Amino acid sequence: MDLSLTNRQQQVLRATVDHYIATAEPVGSKALAREYALSISPATIRNVMGRLEEEGLLFQPHTSAGRVPSDFGYRHYVDELVMPSTTLMSQIKQALDQKLRTDSWIFEVLLRDAAQILATLSGCVALITLPQAATSTIRHLHLVQVEPHRVMLILVTDAYETQSVMMELPHSAWDEVDPDRIEQELQILSNFLNHHFVGSSLQDLVALDPCELDREFQKYTDFLKILLTDLTQQCKSLSPKNILVGGLAEVLRQPEFSELQQAQTLIHLLEDGQDLLRPLFNELMADEIKQGADVVPRSTKVNVRIGSENSLESIQAYSLVSSTYQKGELPMGSVGVLGPTRMAYEKVIALVTVTADYLSTCLTQVA
């Protein structure tokens, strides 16, 4: 629905939304005239608020109360009146630089830390999806003997996730082999796997047919069959990946969750609703890629869904601000903030934007 507002109407709408975000209380014309430099009388403000209510941007929760924004009012506010400043973006970037350790090669640790920081700074729930194991590519493979007849495959993906698979050595093939020789053989096999599968997906490795190996590696056929069987089971157990959640305690302090039922609904969704949230983030990622491909600069690709705009019924009382972090041009996962529709959109949009860009930079720099 296209809507053209006058400058005065936009000023009153912005003041109303800003007041409600800050106080969680309906506001009347006298309060707006007193607290905001609108340069118009309370009577004029009251008339403008009445017009905004007719357009569906504001409503009165009670007949004797002031007005609050509707979902449509928030939508116009976000689309037309919110633009995070470069100063705010720089402050958030500086905060992430100070608080996050990017020297850790375990990317999941970085994501967990980012979720907690995002939740603390936003006062809402932070949601960050881990990269899908099935679409990750292999960065490094290493076979190491951990005890007699037991070998561990250590696998690092391009997202710096680490997986390990423990397996038993085939006794018939290795019983009489010197331990030093076993170590040499494992190194040879590690080199072979790295040469053929670095840059490939886990599925490519799982699909390897040991019977098609070069003659010099035929003696490893039984060993590789066992290894690939165990790795296949490991991959199945990893899909789908979890969603990291931070800040439940933060958002429950908001007045919207003073009622027990509201709080319980949100807690249940975040603790037990992973199967609902993952498809939602996949949908949001697809929308962002479709809308932003080759047109919008990377840092502006933020998806804001407000209240009833959310396809998932259980979050239609909330707003979700999300963006995609990626490695180069390849989307890897999503960063989101979930909170009341009365959230500080300007700050949250800046937080999500900077965090997604930050994670993308970290992934790209370690490529």
Swiss-Prot record:
<dbReference type="InterPro" id="IPR029016">
    <property type="entry name" value="GAF-like_dom_sf"/>
</dbReference>
<keyword id="KW-0346">Stress response</keyword>
<dbReference type="InterPro" id="IPR021153">
    <property type="entry name" value="HrcA_C"/>
</dbReference>
<dbReference type="InterPro" id="IPR036390">
    <property type="entry name" value="WH_DNA-bd_sf"/>
</dbReference>
<dbReference type="InterPro" id="IPR036388">
    <property type="entry name" value="WH-like_DNA-bd_sf"/>
</dbReference>
<keyword id="KW-0678">Repressor</keyword>
<keyword id="KW-0805">Transcription regulation</keyword>
<keyword id="KW-0804">Transcription</keyword>
<comment type="function">
    <text>Negative regulator of class I heat shock genes (grpE-dnaK-dnaJ and groELS operons). Prevents heat-shock induction of these operons.</text>
</comment>
<comment type="similarity">
    <text>Belongs to the HrcA family.</text>
</comment>
<dbReference type="GO" id="GO:0003677">
    <property type="term" value="F:DNA binding"/>
</dbReference>
<dbReference type="InterPro" id="IPR002571">
    <property type="entry name" value="HrcA"/>
</dbReference>
<protein>
    <recommendedName>
        <fullName>Heat-inducible transcription repressor HrcA</fullName>
    </recommendedName>
</protein>
<dbReference type="Pfam" id="PF01628">
    <property type="entry name" value="HrcA"/>
</dbReference>
<dbReference type="GO" id="GO:0045892">
    <property type="term" value="P:negative regulation of DNA-templated transcription"/>
</dbReference>
